[in-house]
Amino acid sequence: MLMEMNRYLSFTLFTGLSLLTTIPIEAYTLNPNKTATSILQTNVIEVRSITSVQPIVIYCPVGTVPQLPYQVWVTYSDGQGEYRQTKWSNSALSTEQSEADDKVYPIGSQYTINGFIIGDDTTENGYPITAKIEVVDTKNTISPKLIAHTIPLNNVKINGNNRLTSNRDLAIKEIISWDVSQQLYNYRDTYGLSTEGYTRSDGWDSPETKLKGHGSGHYMSALALAYAAATNPSHKEILRRNITRMVNELRECQERTFVWSEELGRYLEARDFAPEEELKKMKGTWEAFDEHKTKWATYGYGYLNAIPPHHPALIEMYRAYNNSDWVWAPYYSIHKQLAGLIDIATYMDDKSIADKALLIAKDMGLWVWNRMHYRTYVKKDGTQEEHRTHPGNRYEMWNMYIAGEVGGMGESLARLSEMVSAPEEKARLIEASNCFDSPAFYEPLSKNIDDIRNRHANQHIPMIIGALRSYLSNNDTFYYHVSHNFWNLIQGRYRYSTGGVGNGEMFRQPYTQIVSMAMNGVSEGESHSNPHINETCCAYNLLKLTKDLNCFNPDDARYMDYYERTLYNQIIGSLHPEHYQTTYQYAVGLNASKPWGNETPQSTCCGGTGSENHVKYQEATYFVSDNTLWVALYMPTTLHWEEKNITLQQECLWPAKSSTIKVTAGEARFAMK
């Protein structure tokens, strides 16, 4: 079934015009061929009902679950129409597994799936609908092409006096106030360098936690993004100074691992750390932690982390999430640090510092490749006990709760592979990226089987971002379809109306958002509001995934409609408007209120993503190809399009129902949508 949901209007633009056009955005879910009109006139509500629904016919590739629309076009008794959310009857896992079985539904099979338009009272469950399914001999062989890309953050500025600029300025002032020595403390402690004069870290980077480094990684990203977004020269100078200090001191730590082995005739590498017999006996206690802090010479060439490498090594022994006796999520922490260095390499205009940041990230990325390549493998067949017979089975490593949380390792390693020039390093980094695939999670999704249910939400969303990013280099459509299917399942089954997901950090069963809102606050027989819904990290990562998918589908308005929904309903409101505090979770439900906290990037995971969120609102406002500009968000901004050497200004009151686009400098010819 094809559904057009294009809210963009096309233009051919001749620069030099002072006023181009006004673009309406009202009711963007309405049919673009129809005009939105109010059904509330002179205080009399006109009762209307659904009279018809567009036909739903799905041609389903054999061996997969039909991709059912999460919204369908309905027509009302007054002649108006809009897209409405659906709920389908095939969401039980056993049903989906049957639908994906080519013996049950071979090529040529035809069947129907029933569902409802939710929020309608035609029946107890809603307005009934039916999808007709035909199984076809079509594999997922089409290779989607990258059509567009975003404009770099430093070439888009938010204008005006509004909540967007107020939040940005508040965030930048806070970022420049954070103590850079505190962010360096754990590294110096881990690499045997003096910590005199350095502030001990706190929060989830404190000496009592084994997630050290996650906050420092987010801090580096926040510095880089704030540097790109800042308009105040004195602020930029402080940011530049702190970026420079972070990069120089981290390289000093990393260079302590450059240890030559006469016996091996090469530098010690990641594969040399903790041979198998030693690994099997390795402990995760704080005593062991302190012991490994004294052995930086054994870490292996390029290792850079705020915790010693015995923690990522312990994952190869399938050690559990336990901050006292074993590990927290070591590769999650490594990812944040890689991402921070990559962001510095991307946005720092001091080439020597940008190059050094990239070098640090590359050397650490190659350490990861070395460890994964030589010390890990994938075995999928058999029981869990059989999977774990030998150390290093990635099928089990990345399927563990929390301990196996790797953040966006796949994404960062794929980005690194795009940034380095040596062919061998490119190949190794993309191989390392795919070493963070989770077969137990990916393979059902590749068939559109919903294996999202009951998983830790923010453990798995970044994995999908990594799958999509690696597709750019490995060209394996498996990864694109995993990402595409995941996104569609989120839209249809898991997101709240605000765009967020999760209940107590977990995906629950499909279509149970109302149950979560109603029951999550029940204790001792009494109902009360509970804020543990819509983790902010999840919204952060879903926006990242949506932005990347839109690069392949810039004419499909569903992606940026969702992006806009989540940015405006959760992300922007996750920063206190008067003083710097961000939300961990974003409460919804009767009498719910937002719990404020998270005053530093190391305070919690959402303190980390929160440190980045409010200096990059504009990062997905515009997408471009060679000769097309897509205006994807209606936001008061100034855009400099370097490739065309033109500057455009979008004027609107935020949030707006219309935008005016002006060309303020330069001359070029292109299409605008």
Regions found by a protein language model. Give the residues of each.
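Extracellular interdomain linkers/hinges and stalk-like, low-complexity segments
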Residues: 41-58, 130-150
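Solvent-exposed, low-complexity, repeat-rich "mucin-like" stalks and linkers
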Residues: 39, 43-81
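Glycan-recognition and catalytic cores of secretory/periplasmic carbohydrate-active enzymes
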Residues: 140-673
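Serine/threonine-rich, repeat-prone extracellular segments and beta-strand-based repeat modules
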Residues: 78-135
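Boundary at the C-terminal end of the N-terminal hydrophobic targeting segment
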Residues: 25-29
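Short beta-strand/loop motifs in extracellular/secreted proteins, especially
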Residues: 70, 84, 670-672
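Bacterial N-terminal signal peptides that target proteins for export
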Residues: 2-12
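Bacterial N-terminal signal peptides
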Residues: 12-22
